[in-house]
C-alpha cells in the first residue's frame, strides 16, 4: 500500500478460480445487494440496472474488458492504516461491497476501526468509525450512495478506509463484485 500512497499494509487480490469459500460468499451476497443497488439506481434516476445473478453481472464485466477478479485479503500490522478511497476499477462498477473482519479485536489487534466518510452536497463531510467483531461483515458503498436532498434523493460521494492499528495484526476479506481491467 505504501508505495502507492494507499496507506500502510498489504493487500493481495485473489485470481480466478476464486477459492471456494470466497466464491460462495460473493455468490450469496450479490443477489440481495443487487436489489438494493437497483433501488439506489432508480432513486438517483440512473442506468444501468444490475443483473439479478453474479454470473450475469460478471459476464457483463468481462464483455466490457474487465476480467481481473477483485476480492482481496488485507493485512495491517501495528501502525498500519488504509487511506480514504473508493473502489471503482473500470466503466462497470457495482455500487456496494462487503468487508469481513477475520481477526479478533483485543486478542489479535487494537485500533483499526472501519471508517466511512460521506460528502453531502453543499455541506460538510460526515465521518463514522465502525468497530467490528471477528466475523462481522459490513456492507458499504464503493463510491457513492443516495442521501436525502431538498427535492428528493441526491448523490452522496462516499469513501472508506481503516484507522491506524495500534497493536497486533488486523486481517480483512474484501468482496468487491465488479471485476477490474
Task: Label each PLM-derived region with a short phrase.
Residues 1-181:
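Fe(II)/2-oxoglutarate oxygenase catalytic core
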Amino acid at each position: 500500500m505504501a508505495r502507492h500512497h494507499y496507506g500502510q499494509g498489504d493487500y493481495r487480490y485473489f485470481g480466478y478460480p476464486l477459492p471456494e469459500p470466497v466464491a460462495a460468499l460473493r455468490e450469496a451476497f450479490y443477489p440481495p445487494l443487487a436489489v438494493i443497488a437497483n433501488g439506489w439506481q432508480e432513486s438517483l434516476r440512473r442506468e444501468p440496472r444490475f443483473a439479478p445473478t453474479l454470473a450475469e453481472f460478471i459476464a457483463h464485466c468481462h464483455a466490457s474488458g474487465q476480467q481481473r477478479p477483485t476480492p482481496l485479503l488485507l493485512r495491517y500490522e501495528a501502525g498500519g492504516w488504509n487511506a480514504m478511497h473508493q473502489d471503482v476499477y473500470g466503466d462497470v462498477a457495482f455500487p456496494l461491497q462487503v468487508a469481513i473482519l477475520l481477526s479478533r479485536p483485543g486478542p489479535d489487534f487494537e485500533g483499526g476501526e472501519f471508517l466511512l466518510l460521506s460528502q453531502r452536497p453543499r455541506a460538510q463531510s460526515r465521518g463514522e468509525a465502525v468497530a467490528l467483531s471477528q466475523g462481522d461483515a459490513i456492507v458499504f458503498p464503493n463510491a457513492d450512495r443516495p442521501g436525502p436532498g431538498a427535492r428528493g434523493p441526491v448523490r452522496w460521494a462516499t469513501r472508506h478506509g481503516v484507522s491506524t492499528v495500534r497493536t497486533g495484526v488486523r486481517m480483512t476479506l474484501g468482496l468487491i463484485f465488479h471485476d477490474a481491467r
